[in-house]
Regions:
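Conserved helicase NTPase catalytic core signature
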Residues: 1-61, 74
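Conserved helicase motor core of SF1/SF2 NTP-dependent helicases
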Residues: 47-335
Length: 335
């Protein structure tokens, strides 16, 4: 053991350890290089393409998935490594890159290369067939955000609404539940929550699980504010827990931004905002609305304060669409 060694013996031991560590690193680098040399495709994040293990490698073909989530500087990392053909896949009608700094965001860092190229008029190809949503759930986003170009790759029979929730129309598995509660601002004034909506979300999930037509891992709970995500997480943890083997095991509670690219059989969306001034905050970003209402496969349940939400034109259009089809779940308001 090193502590028992003295003088020259200790120095020699340190030298041997250093030599062995260098040899281990050399062997690891050799094995990694061998794997990379034999690989026809290398998968990495945009920033990961700048790792030292890839610094001498060229990528003549770059395929960037979720390209609208990548900032322009990060997109350049793989492109400058010998790219001759660039394929960008993404949806500029959904959320842009996440930028923490407001100053950087206002300076344009939240604009993706994908969005810039579209704005410049570069020819693009749109994949128009969606395989996720019940056809009814596709209707509004297609009309509002995609010029009515979306088509369905699944039928209503393949996306039956789950039992356990009294849908206003069983042929239209979408429901808007008016909630009269008020939003709360956290102590730091940086996030918001809504206890009335959170309590209703818990009741809705309990009812869905009680019928056995869906399991907890098939349900996604979504909110626009981290304050509401924390409140919901606390409620479900206190009610039994979300770990494996617990009553809500597998239930995911995330922000809208955290659900981009994800899907669940049922999405329960708590909109949080409820105030006399009609302020909706960053719910006013139509891309956030688009992401939230396009995650569900079999059913979508939205909770919110209609008077507040109608101050925003996109939310007003969405609520009008739901109301015209009789999808306001007034029977759930007082439960």
């Amino acid at each position: 053991a090193l502590p028992s060694l003295r003088g020259k013996e200790k120095g020699m031991m340190h030298r041997d350890i250093s030599i062995n560590q260098k040899e281990i690193r050399r062997m690891e680098d050799t094995m990694t290089a061998t794997v990379l040399n034999e690989a026809e495709v290398i998968c990495a994040t945009t920033i990961g393409c700048g790792h030292r293990l890839l610094e001498s490698r060229k990528f003549p073909i770059v395929l960037m998935d979720e390209a609208t989530q990548a900032s322009e500087p990060s997109s350049l990392v793989p492109i400058v490594k010998g790219c001759r053909q660039l394929i960008l896949v993404g949806d500029h009608q959904q959320l842009p890159p996440t930028v923490i700094s407001r100053k950087a965001e206002s300076g344009g860092l939240n604009r993706s290369l994908f969005e810039r190229l579209i704005a410049c008029g570069l020819d693009s190809m749109m994949l128009t067939t969606q395989y996720r949503m019940h056809p009814v759930l596709r209707e509004f986003p297609s009309a509002r955000f995609y010029e009515n170009r979306l088509e369905d790759g699944c039928t209503p029979d393949q996306r039956p609404p789950p039992a356990g929730f009294l849908w206003p129309d069983w042929d239209h598995p979408m429901a808007f539940i008016p909630v009269a509660g008020a939003e709360e601002v956290d102590e730091e004034g940086k996030s918001r929550s809504n206890r009335d909506e959170a309590a209703k979300v818990l009741g809705i999930v309990d009812a869905l699980l009680a019928m056995g037509d869906i399991t907890a891992d098939g349900i996604g709970v979504v909110a626009p504010y981290n304050g509401q995500v924390r409140l919901l997480s606390q409620l479900f943890d206190e009610a039994g827990g979300r770990e494996a083997g617990q009553p809500y095991g597998g239930l995911e509670i995330k922000s809208v931004d955290g659900y981009q690219g994800r899907e669940k059989d049922v999405i329960v969306f708590s909109t949080v905002r409820a105030n006399d001034a009609g302020e909706v905050g960053f719910l006013s970003d139509y891309r956030r609305l688009n992401v939230a209402i396009t995650r569900a496969k079999r059913g979508l349940i939205v909770l919110g304060h209609p008077t507040t939400l109608r101050h925003d034109p996109n939310w007003r259009a969405y609520l009008d669409w739901a109301e015209e089809r009789g999808l306001f779940a007034w029977h759930m308001t007082n439960q």
